[in-house]
């Protein structure tokens, strides 16, 4: 007698399971292991089987989904966002086009301080409603797991408000969220001459954040004009002692030594890395710290020097990709677009890109054992794409290729019959 399960996805043209015993690096990022003419079984929100057609023998499902020969992959993972914020900054785009520098925009009350002001003014519920809108977009683009940072408060009340909003967002919509405390995102004007005092104030929040379960990671912006390597080391060591995983906004502009620090402290990830040194790249490879690259930020800022993804991969660094969704330097929820930018500007292959937005991205936020792979026993987080093969997604840029998103075994996005794009 056939075993009853909830759902069978059949007639899959190409299946990427992304099965891996850990984050991929070097040549293993080329090993995609495509299964053609495939099938997936789901029950109670979990994968029962995934493999070649015929694996469904002995099972009977209440729901059959015919994938029509299309591409099927794990849900995408976005390991770096700033999606809880107030306001927006569209007025700054024309100023940038006219040649106004960021410092000039900042002097006029724009830049990050504008977002800090708007985030302070917003209520917790307003931040949640705005976050729900952005997460709905992310889900529609195939993202089923994401990281979200605070950092637009720079004071106790607003940072806690952001983190609380993020926690509630995780409870009110399908995308799984991992939260990072980033109170050390910038130096407030009132602490310009006393950054150490500001960092100490942020460190004082850690016990309450931990007690309330508001964040899993702590992050700091290690960059010229923000926090030094020495300040960052002290801050992150204390965060680690308080029980937080570590992340670093490292070497976005200058080769300050953020990559080396991330490796030294065995941070889970080092993010940005546009200015990372050769030594920093070597140390990241040796430490296992994952490089989270944000090419959408470089693209949107109109810069021409991108992170050296090709050298990182060749050196053995575990590389992932993220949107860096934020209102100032990367206002997009579209990880598919980032995949195209990674191909064109980071010179990553399609195979490397798929690892970077699934399995490696999941490990970059501590979700490697739960997200980013289609594997028996794991949550059934799956995307059916309006695409014939995996190479098509980074190739055909600027549109949404999602046909259906399945989260924990349930369809949460269906664009079938719609004018896709």
Curated annotation (Swiss-Prot):
- The record lists Zn(2+) as bound by 80, 82, 249, 324
Q: What is this protein called?
A: Imidazolonepropionase
- Give the Gene Ontology MF terms in alphabetical order: imidazolonepropionase activity; iron ion binding; zinc ion binding
**Catalytic reaction annotation:** 4-imidazolone-5-propanoate + H2O = N-formimidoyl-L-glutamate
Part of which pathway?
Amino-acid degradation; L-histidine degradation into L-glutamate; N-formimidoyl-L-glutamate from L-histidine: step 3/3
Q: Has UniProt tagged this entry with the keyword Hydrolase?
A: yes
CDD domains reported in the protein's UniProt record: Imidazolone-5PH
Q: What is the lineage of its organism?
A: Bacteria, Bacillati, Bacillota, Bacilli, Bacillales
The record's comment on cofactor binding reads: Binds 1 zinc or iron ion per subunit.
The organism named in the record is Bacillus velezensis (strain DSM 23117 / BGSC 10A6 / LMG 26770 / FZB42)
The record's EC number reads 3.5.2.7
The record, for PANTHER family, names:
IMIDAZOLONEPROPIONASE, IMIDAZOLONEPROPIONASE-RELATED
**SUPFAM superfamilies noted in UniProt:** Composite domain of metallo-dependent hydrolases, Metallo-dependent hydrolases
Family that this chain belongs to: Belongs to the metallo-dependent hydrolases superfamily. HutI family.
What InterPro entries does the annotation carry?
Answer: Amidohydro_3, HutI, Metal-dep_hydrolase_composite, Metal_Hydrolase
Q: Where does 4-imidazolone-5-propanoate bind?
A: 89, 152, 185, 252, 329
Tell me the compartments it is located in.
Cytoplasm
Q: Which cofactor does it need?
A: Zn(2+); Fe(3+)
**What is the role of this chain?**
Catalyzes the hydrolytic cleavage of the carbon-nitrogen bond in imidazolone-5-propanoate to yield N-formimidoyl-L-glutamate. It is the third step in the universal histidine degradation pathway.
Class of enzymatic activity (EC top level) = hydrolase
Q: Where does Fe(3+) bind?
A: 80, 82, 249, 324
Alphabetically list the UniProt keywords: Cytoplasm, Histidine metabolism, Hydrolase, Iron, Metal-binding, Zinc
Sorted alphabetically, the Gene Ontology cellular component annotations on this record are: cytoplasm
* A single BP term in Gene Ontology: L-histidine catabolic process to glutamate and formamide
């Amino acid at each position: 007698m056939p075993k009853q399960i909830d759902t069978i996805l059949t007639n899959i043209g190409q299946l990427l399971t992304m099965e891996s015993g850990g984050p991929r690096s070097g040549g293993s990022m080329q090993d995609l292991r495509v299964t053609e003419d495939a099938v997936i079984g789901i029950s109670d929100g979990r994968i029962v089987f995934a493999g070649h057609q015929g694996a469904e023998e002995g099972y009977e499902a209440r729901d059959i989904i015919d994938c029509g020969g299309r591409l099927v992959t794990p849900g995408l993972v976005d390991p770096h966002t700033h999606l809880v914020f107030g306001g927006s900054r569209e007025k700054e785009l024309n100023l940038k086009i006219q040649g106004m520098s960021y410092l000039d925009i900042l002097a006029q009350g724009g830049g990050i301080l504008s977002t800090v002001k708007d985030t302070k003014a917003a209520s917790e519920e307003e931040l949640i409603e705005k976050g729900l809108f952005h997460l709905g977009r992310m889900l529609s683009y195939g993202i089923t797991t994401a990281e979200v940072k605070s950092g637009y408060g720079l004071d106790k009340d607003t940072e806690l408000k952001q983190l609380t909003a993020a926690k509630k967002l995780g409870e009110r919509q399908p995308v799984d969220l991992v939260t990072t405390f980033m109170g050390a995102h910038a130096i407030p004007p009132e602490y310009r001459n006393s950054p150490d005092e500001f960092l100490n104030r942020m460190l004082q929040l850690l016990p309450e954040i931990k007690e309330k379960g508001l964040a899993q990671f702590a992050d700091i912006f290690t960059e010229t004009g923000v926090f030094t390597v020495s300040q960052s080391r002290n801050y992150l060591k204390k965060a680690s002692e308080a029980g937080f995983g570590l992340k670093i906004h490292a070497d976005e502009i200058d080769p300050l030594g953020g990559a080396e620090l991330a490796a030294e402290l065995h941070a889970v990830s080092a993010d940005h890395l546009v200015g990372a040194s050769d030594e920093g790249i070597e140390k990241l490879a040796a430490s296992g710290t994952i490089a989270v690259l944000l090419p959408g930020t470089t693209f949107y800022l109109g810069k021409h020097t991108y992170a050296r993804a090709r050298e990182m991969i060749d050196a053995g660094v575990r590389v992932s990709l993220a949107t860096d969704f934020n209102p100032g330097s990367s206002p997009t929820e579209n990880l598919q677009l980032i995949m195209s930018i990674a191909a064109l500007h980071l010179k990553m292959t399609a195979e490397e890109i798929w690892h970077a937005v699934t399995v490696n991205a999941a490990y970059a936020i501590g979700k490697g054992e739960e997200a980013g792979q289609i594997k028996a026993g794991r949550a059934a987080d799956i995307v059916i794409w309006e695409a014939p093969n995996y190479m098509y997604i980074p190739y055909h840029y600027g549109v949404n290729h999602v046909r259906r998103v399945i989260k924990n075994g349930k369809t949460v996005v269906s664009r079938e019959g719609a004018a896709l794009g």
